[in-house]
Design a protein with these regions (language model features):
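Amphipathic, alpha-helical segments enriched in basic
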Residues: 50, 54-58, 63, 84, ...
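Long hydrophobic segments that form regular secondary structure
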Residues: 83, 88-91
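Claisen-condensing/thiolase-fold acyl-transfer catalytic domains that form or cleave C-C bonds
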Residues: 72, 76, 90, 94-182
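Condensing-enzyme catalytic core mediating Claisen C-C bond formation in acyl metabolism
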Residues: 1-73, 77-81, 168, 177-182
Length: 182
C-alpha cells in the first residue's frame, strides 16, 4: 500500500546541470549560478522521517506522517547555522529554492524559516505545474529563478544576488547550497 501511495504522489522528471570552473566576473559566468558552499545536516531524532530500502521490487520509500513537522522544527536552526558560516542572515537571501516535495513540505519549510508565500513562489510554481519529481525538483525551481533573474536584467532592473537552495534526504537530512548569481 505504501508503494502505491508513493507512486501516486510522485511525478516524473529529469534535470541536469553543467558545472564549470569559470571565474566570477568572466563573460561566460555572467548570468549563471555560482556555488559558494554546500552543507549537509542530519536532523536529530528524525530517523523515521524518510527511509529508503532496496527489495526485490526495487527501491521502497517510507515517509513518516511527522516529516513536515520535522522540517518546520529544524530548518530555522539549520539555515541560520549554514548562513552564519558566511556571516549571512536569512534577510540577505534574494531567493529561496525549497524542494517542492508536496504542499505540507513547502508550507512547513516556510513556517520553520519564517518565509512568505512570495519567497516560496518558485517552489509552489514547480509543485503546481510538475508535482514532486524527487531529486530533479529543486533543479526546476532553480531554472525558474535564473529565468526571472535574466528577465530582470533584460529590463534594466537589478537582478538577484544570492540565495539558498535545499532539499531533503533520508534520515531526515537537509542538503543546502548557497548560491551567488554571477
Amino acid at each position: 500500500v505504501n508503494d502505491a501511495i508513493l507512486h501516486a504522489i510522485f511525478a516524473d522528471g529529469c534535470a541536469a546541470a553543467v558545472i564549470s570552473g569559470e571565474k566570477p566576473g568572466s563573460q561566460k559566468a555572467k548570468g549563471k549560478f555560482g556555488i559558494v558552499d554546500t552543507h549537509g545536516w542530519l536532523m536529530e531524532g528524525t530517523e523515521d522521517g524518510i527511509t529508503l530500502s532496496i527489495n526485490e521490487n526495487g527501491i521502497s520509500c517510507i515517509l513518516s506522517k511527522y516529516l513536515p513537522q520535522y522540517i518546520a522544527k529544524n530548518m530555522g536552526g539549520y539555515v541560520e547555522s549554514f548562513l552564519g558560516m558566511h556571516n549571512l542572515q536569512k534577510s540577505d537571501m534574494d531567493f529561496w529554492a525549497i524542494h517542492p516535495g508536496g504542499r505540507r513540505i513547502i508550507e512547513e519549510a516556510q513556517n520553520g524559516l519564517g518565509l512568505s508565500e512570495e519567497q516560496a513562489k518558485y517552489s509552489w510554481n514547480v509543485l503546481s505545474n510538475y508535482g514532486n519529481m524527487l531529486s530533479p525538483s529543486v533543479m526546476f525551481v532553480l531554472e525558474l529563478i535564473l529565468n526571472d533573474h535574466k528577465k530582470a536584467l533584460a529590463k534594466g532592473e537589478r537582478g538577484l544576488k544570492q540565495g539558498l537552495a535545499f532539499s531533503f534526504s533520508p534520515g531526515v537530512g537537509a542538503e543546502g547550497v548557497l548560491i551567488k548569481v554571477m
